[in-house]
Amino acid sequence: MISISDTAQAHFRKLLKKQPDGTNIRVFVVNPGTQNAECGVSYCPPDAVDPEDQHLPFSGFDCLVDPLSAPYLVDATIDFVTDQMGSQLTLKAPNAKMRKVADDAPLIDRIEYVLMSEVNPMLAGHGGKVTLVELTEDKLAILQFGGGCNGCSMVDYTLKEGIEKQLLEKFPGELNGVKDATEHQRGDHSYY
């Protein structure tokens, strides 16, 4: 469920040595399954352990996860990175805002999942987003851009070279392409 790098494990062990015996870490998601989802890591003293918590054993400590957060932390990774700017702990949880869908889920659900978990986080850097409007009988995903993508001069490139390539690679034989249904209006909100 959660992968913790060796450097992050060493960092946690160092921090936990300064805590009372039996203290572990807790990884959680606040507002899971929403666009406002936020992940966190905290100390978890023995008296804060719930019987329903999942215990993920690591070297020298356990990682506890509450049942509500668990499905949103599938494929989460925690790393501790040191560079010229210093050190930082990173937690990446690609499913925090939306539960991972099964490989055999309907195509429309799998496309929506990829848009929300992979495409929109990249577009968000420009204040943009994309949503799936419909999936046609001829296997075309009809998309609508919003935010900074609406009216952006790079939207055609983003659609064909970015999103379409990514979706066709993920769903070969199931999807024939993507089309933009957005009525683009250039304005101050447009990224380019």
Swiss-Prot record:
The keyword tRNA processing does not apply. It holds the Pfam family NifU. GO terms for biological process: iron-sulfur cluster assembly; protein maturation. GO terms for molecular function: 4 iron, 4 sulfur cluster binding; iron ion binding. Binds 1 [4Fe-4S] cluster per subunit. The cluster is presumably bound at the interface of two monomers. SUPFAM superfamilies: Fe-S cluster assembly (FSCA) domain-like (SSF117916), HesB-like domain (SSF89360). InterPro entries: Fe/S_biogenesis_protein_NfuA (IPR017726), FeS_biogenesis (IPR000361), FSCA_dom_sf (IPR034904), HesB-like_dom_sf (IPR035903), NIF_FeS_clus_asmbl_NifU_C (IPR001075). The keyword Heme does not apply. Its cofactor is [4Fe-4S] cluster. Keywords: 4Fe-4S, Iron, Iron-sulfur, Metal-binding. [4Fe-4S] cluster binds at C149, C152. Homodimer. Involved in iron-sulfur cluster biogenesis. Binds a 4Fe-4S cluster, can transfer this cluster to apoproteins, and thereby intervenes in the maturation of Fe/S proteins. Could also act as a scaffold/chaperone for damaged Fe/S proteins. Belongs to the NfuA family. This is Fe/S biogenesis protein NfuA. It comes from Aeromonas salmonicida (strain A449). The lineage of its organism: Bacteria, Pseudomonadati, Pseudomonadota, Gammaproteobacteria, Aeromonadales.
